[in-house]
Amino acid sequence: MDLTYKRQNVYALADENELKAISDYAQGYKKFLDNGKTEREVVAESVEWIEKEGYKPYTLGDAITPGDKLYYNNRGKGLFILRAGSADIAKNGVRILVAHVDSPRLDLKQVPLFEKASLAYLKTHYYGGIKKYQWLTIPLAIHGVVALKDGTNVTVRVGEDENDPVFYITDLLPHLSQEQVTKTIADGFPAENLNLLVGGIPVKDDEKDAVKKGVLQILHDKYGVSEEDFISAELEAVPAVKAKDVGFDRAFVASYGHDDRVCTYPEITATLQTETEQTVLCILADKEEIGSEGNTGMQCVLINDILNEIARSYGVNPSVLREHSKCISADVTAGYDPAYASAFEEMNAGFVNCGVTMNKFTGSRGKSGSNDASAEYIGYLRGVLAKENVIWQTGELGRVDLGGGGTVAKFIANMNIDTVDMGVPVLSMHAPYELISKADIYTAHKAFSAFVK
């Protein structure tokens, strides 16, 4: 009997049928990525998807009965998908899956448009933790909405179609970079310089800000908006690139937004496709990258409101419901990268191709800001995954004292709900173009399916 713990390579153990299933699953995921590059787009895409599966809109206060398939759309930026089961929720609670649909990006400022040296720019304010230099000299698209004073929304999506223009942030040529290259990365790329180049043709017979006015005219002709309308807009600059297979063997997928859509997609497929008597609540949350704040983040009381509605409809004390519920915070982790091996402690790192990764805790340094899941809950999940023959691994987010990160797990756990982080290891996390293994997202689907059973 082998008493040691060893990671298993998913590809090495997969037969031909399993390899085909992994590849086919990734094809659907890549379409999901390309269609949804912002939190609003992911929610809209998901609503369209689940409505085809028979899910209906839910209004707070409505009764919920076993067999119902419902969703609650939170301001177009968050989504709660509910499968009301027949199991006794006073004993079993609710199976909760939570992923987030916001990703690091560049938001346009409220007064963004200016002209300098006959070039028109849009000023940005970065969202989430980025390395600013990675956003220079790459093609960028603009996605989002402009909310007009009459209450209507104008949808903007420029840079994705073959004939669309893209947008661009310049960098300094190496020949004149002697001063720039001596600075630290933090100081060498000021955030106020992350300005999108958006135009260069002046309107005729106008001397002042002629290029800026030309851009405004285009925006007015296409969208019916004026400069003032930027004040009530949510416009995001995101990479204008498609999800692509990586490697001669196509083992990987590179894309913008793997964090955290690589967990969003399998939590939805697990919710829709798994036969179960349990009541399942699948949550797509916003604002995780900036601390889960606001009324679309997981610090909002809305999750408690929905759990209370479930409890009321089933005639169960809400406190009892929460006590017996279980949650997976479906969020990515750092994949071990041999190019940067010193950032990791190899024995306790998540490896790509070795399955979905369970993080008992996250946080930073001395586990600060972490949800530290109990040994008993980890043991329970080990049994669940073993029963369904799911390949998975354990991991930490980098070596101790180097840094760290947080997830939504602690906010769910604060409600007296057993919660643990489980997600796909990512290489180049928070870069404009991240990398994941097709095998790992497939095992995430299998793990989440086992959990909701």
Where in the sequence are the language-model features?
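N-terminal hydrophobic/helix-forming segments and targeting peptides
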Residues: 1-453
